[in-house]
Design a protein with these regions (language model features):
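Membrane-embedded alpha-helical segments of integral membrane proteins
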Residues: 2-50
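Internal/C-terminal transmembrane anchor helices
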Residues: 58-83
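Hydrophobic alpha-helical transmembrane segments of polytopic
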Residues: 4-7, 67-73, 237
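Membrane-water interface at transmembrane helix exits
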Residues: 17-21, 46-49, 76-84, 244
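A transmembrane-helix-recognition feature enriched in membrane-embedded lipid enzymes
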Residues: 231-249
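Membrane-helix interface/capping segments
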Residues: 48-59
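A structural signal for short, hydrophobic/glycine-enriched beta-strand patches
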Residues: 79-235
């Protein structure tokens, strides 16, 4: 129990620090709540066990059974989604594909978030080797509402030597599904190369590919590394995202 208590305390501090850095999302909140519950359950397990021994009514047993089923379902979903996330990797890239870069947050000053900057830097490696590739930067207004992710990404690419006439903006999307759907519209409206390379974070490749198939894109995937200090939050958030896409379909 001491190990669980320490783990719960560590998780609580970790996710509080993550939120302090400005990465406030459903993954961070979930991680924080679960960590607090683990800490409390481990610290007060003797009191909890004593309380449980005094409450053995049928209603109590039913509540416990439901709780155990919910916990089992959550763990099962977590294992399945984690397996799916780990199962997809970057695959071989064709030359001069249309590059679709998926947005992931903008800082208050309009600069890309650390996660989005990793995606851009990964895309730049391919773009410098494929000078005839067109680029679609995809992402609307972030939660702060000041800058669109697409505009922030365009500015960053231009600063790093990419010509502006190669870049097409998709600045209306607010979800991965809309990223793919609206980018497909930009692709068709501008008669760009139908073979696309979707650039996103490594943890996000499964869902990006899932939606690319849904919209019948001829696609390949290129994953970027995720900063270690936000990976747990984004990983948990991605589990919700995968579940949402399954339900939406």
């Amino acid at each position: 129990m001491k190990i669980l208590e320490i783990a719960g305390l560590f998780g609580t501090i970790w996710f509080l620090c993550t939120e302090g850095l400005g990465y406030w999302n459903i993954g961070t909140n979930t991680g924080l709540i679960v960590s607090v519950l683990i800490f409390l359950a481990a610290k007060y397990h003797c009191q909890i066990r004593e309380w449980c021994s005094r409450h053995k009514s049928r209603f109590y047993k039913m509540i416990c059974s439901i709780l155990y089923l919910v916990i089992a379902a959550v763990i099962s979903l977590a294992v399945i989604t984690t397996g799916l996330i780990l199962s997809v990797h970057s695959n071989g890239q064709k030359e001069n594909s249309t590059v679709i870069i998926l947005g992931s947050g903008v800082n208050d000053d309009g600069r890309p978030s650390d996660v989005m900057r990793e995606r851009l830097d990964t895309a730049l490696e391919y773009l410098n080797d494929n000078p005839h590739s067109a680029i679609i930067v995809s992402g609307g207004l972030d939660d702060q509402g000041g800058y669109t992710e697409a505009e922030s990404m365009k500015d960053y690419l231009i600063e790093h030597g990419i010509k502006s006439d190669r870049i097409y903006l998709e600045n209306q999307s607010h979800s991965t599904r809309e990223n793919i759907e609206y980018s497909e519209t930009v692709l068709q409206n501008n008669h760009l190369n139908a073979s696309v390379l979707i650039v996103t974070s490594d943890f996000h490749l499964y869902r990006a590919g899932y939606l690319a198939r849904h919209y019948h894109l001829d696609y390949e995937l290129l994953g970027s590394p995720t900063p270690w200090y936000v990976l747990p939050s984004y990983w948990i958030r991605e589990m919700y995202g995968i579940l949402h896409e399954w339900i939406a379909d």
